[in-house]
Amino acid sequence: MRVATCIMVACLVLTAGSVSAEWFGDVYIGQSFTEKSDVTVHSSAGLGIFRDVEFDRSLAYGGRFGRYFDGAPFLGLGVDVFNFSPRIGPQRVRVDGCVPSGGCNGGQGGTNKLDVDALAISLDLILRLPLLKTETAPWGSVQPYITAGMPLFRTTVTPRTTAQFRNHDEDTGYSFGYKLGGGIALQVAQNLMLFAEYRFTHVRASVELRDATTLHHAPLRMDLDTHSVLVGLSARW
């Protein structure tokens, strides 16, 4: 691993020319796939853990703006804004602890429908490898890259058809997560690149919904481990 890192850094140094660095603005769209997660609910009946809850596939979209450094044009910073909505559909799952139908000995339970909307804003570090340089593409007409960041997530959960929570009474929580990604950008016109990107994001979302019976707060927690496949356009100047 150390040898591979040294080779990559050496390649980046060798490909860094005397030209000044560049600004960039990206827009992208794609699909997100969120892994199964345990959902923890503290209701008036007690603690219940809904095991292996599935999330629907979601449209993902966003934008990114930033700049590569003058002294190291292979290294840049960007502000990324990213949205996806991994809805929880009606399903039967195993529940440990208190079940919505009553009793705290576990058993089968249903989630019914909850809307989940996640908006993330992140300051990303970007490392690119400029390949196939030309006069019209001084930073490379082919650019593999990797990114990493610690996004702030705003997660809104809205019960729609549940018996456990007060429906249409949403709550929003804020929490930090992390993001790792990689992709490749190809020049399609002067100052314009087409790119494809994979990213993985993680956040532990926490909100407080309303108990349908008592109207007291019912904290809900879940992990959103999400794989996103994106395509987009990048303006460079």
PLM features: residue spans?
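Extracellular loop and loop/strand-boundary signature of outer-membrane beta-barrel proteins
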Residues: 46-53, 106-114, 163-171, 215-221
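Outer-membrane beta-barrel translocator domains and adjoining extracellular loop/strand segments
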Residues: 37-45, 89-96, 156-166, 206-214
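N-terminal signal peptide c-region/cleavage motif recognized by signal peptidases
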Residues: 16-18
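Residues that define the transmembrane beta-barrel architecture of outer-membrane proteins
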Residues: 55-61, 117-121, 142, 168-178, ...
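Predominantly the C-terminal beta-signal and adjacent terminal strand-loop region
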Residues: 38-40, 49, 104, 189-237
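Bacterial N-terminal signal peptides that target proteins for export
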Residues: 1-7
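Surface-exposed strand-loop-strand hairpins of Gram-negative outer-membrane beta-barrel proteins
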Residues: 32-61, 173-174
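Gram-negative (and chloroplast) outer-membrane scaffold detector with strong preference
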Residues: 22, 31, 64-161, 226-237
